[in-house]
């Protein structure tokens, strides 16, 4: 029988404390980050008072999150810090006004993932981010900008799903992309199909991409 350590606080509070530890360690490597301590302290203080995983009705929490994310992006801080702040916002259903740095952090984590389990975890985080930012970005008002976070997030979501080779995840991500980026569906599946024709790609992956490609390019 193995002994399990006792944790104080709910899972959200534990995650926020772990973020605080990562932040303090990052400060030792980059002294510029010390200026952000009031914001990180506030995340912990809110968790202590309201719990770590509940919707917040507090004023200015969205500004707190956006400020931290913008500062982390400006200082080019370690991506995991931005991801930690974003996860705090997701747990509390706080809208994120600064999305690009989080999208980039998730892309890096996806690129570094080596196992199906790691890819599935990134998939879940991307799914949560899409749910959080949909009210803010779903109008997709910057369609002329190929680097806009709404587009990059959905493209990365679909690519991560393909890498999992999980049919259900691919179907979910493809449905999300089809709805979010109607003008780019055909192009995405054309490029994806060219890649999955290589040997060694699972049949389920190829079949699903072929079906979407046919759906959105037939009759062009």
Where are these regions (language model features)?
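Alpha-solenoid repeat scaffolds
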Residues: 117, 129-136, 168, 183-187
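Residue at a conserved register position within TPR or TPR-like alpha-solenoid repeats
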Residues: 26, 109-113, 161-162
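Amphipathic alpha-helical scaffolding segments
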Residues: 104-105, 124-128, 172-181
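Repeat-mediated protein-protein interaction surfaces in helical alpha-solenoids
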Residues: 1-2, 80-89, 126-143
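Alpha-helical oligomerization segments
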Residues: 146-220
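N-terminal alpha-helical scaffold/docking segments in eukaryotic complex subunits
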Residues: 1-67
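Long amphipathic alpha-helical segments with strong coiled-coil/leucine-zipper propensity
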Residues: 52-127
């Amino acid at each position: 029988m193995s002994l399990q350590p006792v944790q104080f606080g709910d899972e959200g509070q534990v995650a926020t404390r772990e973020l605080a530890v990562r932040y303090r360690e990052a400060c030792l490597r980059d002294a510029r980050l010390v200026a952000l301590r009031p914001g990180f302290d506030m995340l912990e203080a809110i968790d202590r008072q309201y719990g770590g995983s509940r919707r917040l009705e507090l004023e200015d929490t969205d500004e707190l999150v956006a400020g931290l994310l913008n500062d982390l992006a400006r200082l080019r801080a370690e991506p995991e810090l931005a991801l930690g702040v974003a996860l705090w916002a997701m747990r509390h259903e706080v809208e994120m006004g600064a999305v690009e740095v989080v999208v980039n952090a998730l892309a890096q984590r996806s690129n570094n993932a080596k196992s199906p389990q790691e890819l599935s975890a990134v998939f879940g985080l991307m799914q949560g981010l899409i749910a959080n930012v949909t009210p803010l970005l779903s109008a997709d008002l910057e369609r002329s900008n190929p680097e806009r976070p709404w587009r990059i997030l959905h493209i990365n979501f679909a690519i991560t799903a393909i890498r999992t080779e999980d049919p259900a995840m691919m179907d979910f991500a493809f449905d999300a992309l089809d709805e979010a980026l109607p003008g780019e569906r055909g192009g995405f599946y054309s490029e994806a199909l060219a890649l999955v024709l290589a040997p060694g790609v699972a049949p389920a992956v190829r079949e699903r991409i072929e079906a979407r490609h046919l759906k959105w390019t037939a009759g062009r």
